[in-house]
């Protein structure tokens, strides 16, 4: 029975993430004594039932979670304070990811993962110390019951693909008019998105698309005309709302600029405070004998 029970937890269940760490067979009540059967058909049926039950359980758990639950989990995982302007970034991203995770139509996909990683990296640029930045990202994912490595690996895979393609080739790949042997699973995901009328579009998904285009051809996204043309092609192929995608990306770029300006202001304030501190330390270490000499002149 142990062998049958563990089989789906490694491969079949990987796309659903962990369920409160419950991969122990003793908690899968539906696997009764007959599951000890060595019949291949029976084993296959049990595995599929395990996948279905675990997916339903995870969905129910996530659906019942509140924003407060997610925040509480996050601050239990990441216990250090978050610096000034970055705190709002973290909490807004956390809320956005939470609301998606509890939406019945939402499904994780690699482009969404790239959007999450890209948004985090861009908005958290300059955060110190680096180990805290890593801890914050890990906390965001784990607070939602997901694995940060899955996000990072999927994002890195898509980035590597985009960097070896031209902008034109990438758009063709996203349209599924061009394919590559090592990306069949990714294109299957694109096909599922395009054919799903209930696909839950998100700003983070749009950021993932933008990041792909950016990695393939930076000049393409810098020019408004070529950027718009490419986005229209991709949106048409994936049945995405172009106007919504365009507005979300305009806001994304605008917010990146504002964040860059805020970092400059923050750095100026830090430098000013450092100079004041150094001045006070210099005055405090002034020679007492020098003060006496000045008073006698």
Regions found by a protein language model. Name each.
Residues 37, 86-103, 178-195:
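Short amphipathic alpha-helical segments and their helix-coil junctions
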Residues 46-154, 208, 229, 235-245, ...:
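N-terminal domain-start signal
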Residues 20-24:
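Intrinsic low-complexity, disordered N-terminal segments enriched in polar/charged/small residues
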Residues 156-203, 210-214:
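Short, solvent-exposed interaction modules
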Residues 123-127, 213-221:
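Short loop/beta submotifs within extracellular cysteine-rich repeat domains
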């Amino acid at each position: 029975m142990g062998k049958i029970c563990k089989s789906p937890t490694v491969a079949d269940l990987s796309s659903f993430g962990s369920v409160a760490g419950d991969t122990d067979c003793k908690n899968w009540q539906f696997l009764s004594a007959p599951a000890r059967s060595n019949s291949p058909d029976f084993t296959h049926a049990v595995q599929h039932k395990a996948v279905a039950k675990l997916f339903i359980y995870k969905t129910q758990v996530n659906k019942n979670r509140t924003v407060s639950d997610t925040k509480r989990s996050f601050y239990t995982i990441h216990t250090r304070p978050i610096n000034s302007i970055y705190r709002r970034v973290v909490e807004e991203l956390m809320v956005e990811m939470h609301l998606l995770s509890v939406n019945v139509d939402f499904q994780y996909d690699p482009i969404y993962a790239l959007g999450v990683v890209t948004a985090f990296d861009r908005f958290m640029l300059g955060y110190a110390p680096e180990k805290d930045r890593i801890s914050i990202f890990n906390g965001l994912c784990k607070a939602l019951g997901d694995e940060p490595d899955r996000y990072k690996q999927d994002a890195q895979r898509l980035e590597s693909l985009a960097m070896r393609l031209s902008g034109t080739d990438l758009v063709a790949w996203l349209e599924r008019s061009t394919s590559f042997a090592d990306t069949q699973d990714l294109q299957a995901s694109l096909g599922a998105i395009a054919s799903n009328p209930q696909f839950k579009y998100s700003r983070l998904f749009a950021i993932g698309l933008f990041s792909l285009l950016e990695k393939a051809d930076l000049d393409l996204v810098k020019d408004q005309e070529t950027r718009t043309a490419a986005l229209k092609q991709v949106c048409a192929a994936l049945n995405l709302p172009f106007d919504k995608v365009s507005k979300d990306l305009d806001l994304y770029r605008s917010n990146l600029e504002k964040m860059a300006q805020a970092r400059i202001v923050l750095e100026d304030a830090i430098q000013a405070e450092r100079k004041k501190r150094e001045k006070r330390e210099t005055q405090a270490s002034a020679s007492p004998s020098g003060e006496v000499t000045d008073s006698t002149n």
